[in-house]
Amino acid sequence: MKERRRRRRKLLPAGGLLALGLGTFWFYQRQAMPWMRRWGASDEELQAVLPGDELIPGPELTTTRAVTIQAPAEKIWPWLVQMGADRGGMYSYTWLEALLNCPQVNADRIHPEWQDLQVGDRVRLCMGEMPPPYTVVAIEPGCALVLAHPALTEEDRQFGPWFDTWAFVLQPADSGATRLIVRSRTARAVSWLRWIEAGVFVMERGMLLGIRDRAEGRIRAS
């Protein structure tokens, strides 16, 4: 009898940890992940067809995130076209980028020398080649900037010429404000994407807020 009680006491903590783990996994899959994938976006924005969608017509993974910026599109657009680790930065958390061995400096003003972005140019997330730079595939000045990674492996090319797209779309809102909508579409949801999805959300949310603060003049040029 005493031996059974000892075993039961040992099993109770293990069972509690298992239940906690399963509960955390359920919450992440059913609550946190759907919220992260549509942070800030309205139902209409989720359903809207945006520039770049046609490049991957049947994605396995899509995120649509958005923020309202109290500024017209022409005040926001220059911040978008100068993005890049080797240019104006990604406007996110530099301390976290440094921890990820991706140090960069976020611009606090518009740089005229970085405004002539063209289709075919590359936009780097980090200095160097990892992660691979995005290629600019479409530009609608003042409206939309679409970046993409080409499908490099034979397996990926079975899903089409593009592995993923990243679109930045500006749409007018009430009272002179603008909605910045960022949509990512991935042709093939490879397993490693699931492991980094939460981190990508943190960085992209930081980027959206960073662009908003700069366009609204909350961050003063040094």
Protein language model regions, located:
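Short alpha-helical segments used as structural interaction elements across diverse proteins
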Residues: 4-7, 106, 202, 209
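Helix N-terminus capping/helix-initiation residues
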Residues: 41-43, 120, 200
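Bulky hydrophobic/aromatic packing residues
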Residues: 1, 7-10, 77-79, 166, ...
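Short, charged, low-complexity patches
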Residues: 192-208
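Glycine-rich portal/gate segments that line the openings of hydrophobic small-molecule binding cavities
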Residues: 48, 56-60, 68-74, 81-167, ...
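Short amphipathic, positively biased membrane-proximal segments
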Residues: 1-57, 62, 74-75, 158, ...
